[in-house]
Amino acid sequence: MPYAHGGDADLYYEIHGAGTPILLSAGMGGGAGFWRPQIEALAARHQVILYDHAGTGRSGRDIGPRSITEMARDMARVLDAAGVEDAHVAGHAIGGIIGMELALAAPERVRSLTIVNGWARADGFLRRCFEVRKRILLASGPEAYVRAQPLFLYPPRWIAENIAVLEEEEAQMVAHFPGTQTMLNRIETFLAFDGRERLADIRVPTLLAAAKDDALVPSYLSTLLAEGIPDARIAEVDWGAHAFSAVTPDVFNEMLLGFCGEIDQ
């Protein structure tokens, strides 16, 4: 298994396909597996790079609190290890924030930026959601935290129709949970992030992808991002909730491939 070395945590990564590189960065869970519904479609046209965030999955676990700046450096290390100078960067929620930080720190490495259900700063609603998740984790433990997660991520009908799939995923997530303190550290880092004053400094082509029925990160937060980032565009779907890339992968894949294709022309 390939790893990016050189920092305080070895970072597991995967490469699929060939072509102009696309680096995918997951959200709160941090695992490369979040992007499984994207691999086949994207790898037919691009070199697809996935990785586990530091402290999660198969990456090094022995880390303390990690800033967004450090997470962006991790992202750059993965590109270095893969031998990639620049890539389209797509991040889900927190992964998008990390991509935004890389676009600010090293714009020459980001061909384009796609932020899926992201935000510039956690507002009162989003903070309440994260605080509830923290309390579930602290009061009831990792299993309850994991079992509550679909309620934040997926549409009710999709949950009802995919109970067996969710139960299988939950068993894996509990077995490989990053640890309570690591997850709490990640939540605190994301709540502390405030990128509002630097949005105008983002100079790479940017797409804000959002789901109108996202009950965790409302789509108006993507609208605010689009208003602050020069020449950014927003693409919204009606249904799919926070994890619409998994719920309606064909829709998301077409959206991302179309955007990257325009940039590569």
Swiss-Prot record:
InterPro entries referenced in this protein's UniProt entry, alphabetically: AB_hydrolase, AB_hydrolase_1, AB_hydrolase_fold, Pyrimidine_utilisation_RutD
EC number, as in UniProt: 3.5.1.-
Top-level taxon: Bacteria
Record keywords: Hydrolase
Coiled-coil region list: none
Pfam families (UniProt xref): Abhydrolase_1
Catalytic reaction annotation: carbamate + 2 H(+) = NH4(+) + CO2
GO molecular function: hydrolase activity, acting on carbon-nitrogen (but not peptide) bonds, in linear amides
Task performed by this protein: Involved in pyrimidine catabolism. May facilitate the hydrolysis of carbamate, a reaction that can also occur spontaneously.
NCBIfam families reported for this sequence: RutD
PANTHER family: AB HYDROLASE-1 DOMAIN-CONTAINING PROTEIN, HYDROLASE, ALPHA/BETA FOLD FAMILY PROTEIN
Protein name: Putative carbamate hydrolase RutD
Biological source species: Azorhizobium caulinodans (strain ATCC 43989 / DSM 5975 / JCM 20966 / LMG 6465 / NBRC 14845 / NCIMB 13405 / ORS 571)
